[in-house]
């Protein structure tokens, strides 16, 4: 893949958007291009790298209740289901049916390495399971309650629990804002849905133990010269750490803040 990237140095808006998901390559479609403009590159990827079986284009939009991007098949097998390897884990998923972002890989590891043995954890928006399963594998908590409203995410999460033998993870299908009240209070709550950060924060404060930790992912819009991390940390009481997860556009960011409940 590095060879192809070097060949695309003059098209930085394309090569910076390439993600490898198992045996599938996803190319983010730049604002100034159409999916069909990427077909030649997609075919070159297939001919250069035999392990790549399919190439897809992804529009930048994230829509609907399940936060799904719009994908366009470009070349190779018309298949979007694959096994994705990240850190010590394997995940079976269909990226057209569940939220997927390789950019969250660092966050999955950062959170998981903070988990302590026998913790009670609630993941409010679990998706196909990367936060929950890696936390179980590395931290050996007592239990990770993993909630998601997307039936496909719930299905893949159950498969991935078995695939990784992460039996501390308990998949729960439904609305986190309702199902969370059926659960015991947690030592740690993960809330990785930036669009619903304010509501998630208020609910998490009710269900986290005193001295417990909330990992809250939020959207921040800035004016020129403003620090999105500082804005987020000032907004959410108890914040002691923050970092930019990704830039959505020049004035909007996804930021994570770690919060200690008092």
Swiss-Prot record:
Full protein name: tRNA 4-demethylwyosine(37)-methyltransferase Taw21
Disulphide-bonded residues: none
Function text: Catalyzes the C7-methylation of 4-demethylwyosine (imG-14) at position 37 in tRNA(Phe).
Cross-referenced PROSITE patterns: SAM_MT_TRM5_TYW2
Location, primary (coarse class): cytoplasm
Binding-site residues for S-adenosyl-L-methionine, renumbered to this chain: 108, 125, 148-149, 175-176
Gene Ontology cellular component list: cytoplasm
Localization: Cytoplasm
Family membership noted in the UniProt record: Belongs to the class I-like SAM-binding methyltransferase superfamily. TRM5/TYW2 family.
EC nos: 2.1.1.-
Transferase found in the keyword field: yes
Keyword check for S-adenosyl-L-methionine: yes
PANTHER family named in the record: TRNA (GUANINE(37)-N1)-METHYLTRANSFERASE, TRNA METHYLTRANSFERASE
Assigned keywords, A-Z: Cytoplasm, Methyltransferase, S-adenosyl-L-methionine, Transferase, tRNA processing
Record GO terms (molecular function): tRNA methyltransferase activity
Annotated SUPFAM superfamilies: S-adenosyl-L-methionine-dependent methyltransferases
Alphabetical GO biological process terms: tRNA N1-guanine methylation
Reactions mediated catalytically: 4-demethylwyosine(37) in tRNA(Phe) + S-adenosyl-L-methionine = isowyosine(37) in tRNA(Phe) + S-adenosyl-L-homocysteine + H(+)
């Amino acid at each position: 893949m590095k060879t192809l990237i070097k060949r695309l140095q003059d098209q930085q808006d394309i090569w910076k958007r390439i993600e490898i998901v198992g045996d599938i390559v996803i190319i983010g479609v730049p604002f100034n291009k159409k999916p069909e403009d990427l077909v030649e590159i997609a075919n070159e990827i297939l001919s250069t790298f035999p392990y790549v079986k399919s190439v897809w284009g992804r529009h930048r939009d994230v829509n609907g209740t399940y936060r799904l991007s719009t994908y366009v098949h470009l070349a190779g097998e018309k298949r979007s289901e694959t096994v994705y390897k990240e850190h010590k884990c394997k995940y079976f998923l269909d990226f057209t049916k569940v939220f997927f972002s390789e950019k969250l890989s660092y966050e999955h590891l950062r959170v998981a390495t903070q988990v302590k043995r026998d913790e009670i954890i609630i993941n409010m928006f679990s998706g196909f399971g990367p936060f929950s399963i890696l936390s179980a594998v590395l931290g050996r908590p007592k239990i990770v309650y993993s909630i998601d409203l997307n039936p496909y995410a719930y299905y893949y999460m159950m498969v991935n629990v078995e695939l990784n033998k992460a039996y501390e993870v308990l998949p729960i299908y439904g609305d986190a804002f309702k199902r969370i009240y059926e659960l015991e209070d947690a030592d740690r709550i993960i809330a990785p849905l930036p669009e619903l950060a304010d509501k998630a924060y208020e609910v998490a404060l009710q269900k986290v133990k005193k001295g417990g930790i909330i990992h809250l992912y939020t959207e921040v819009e800035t004016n020129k010269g403003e620090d999105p991390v500082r804005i987020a940390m000032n907004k959410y009481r108890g914040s002691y750490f923050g970092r930019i997860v990704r830039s959505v556009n020049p004035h909007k960011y996804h930021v994570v803040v770690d919060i200690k409940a008092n």
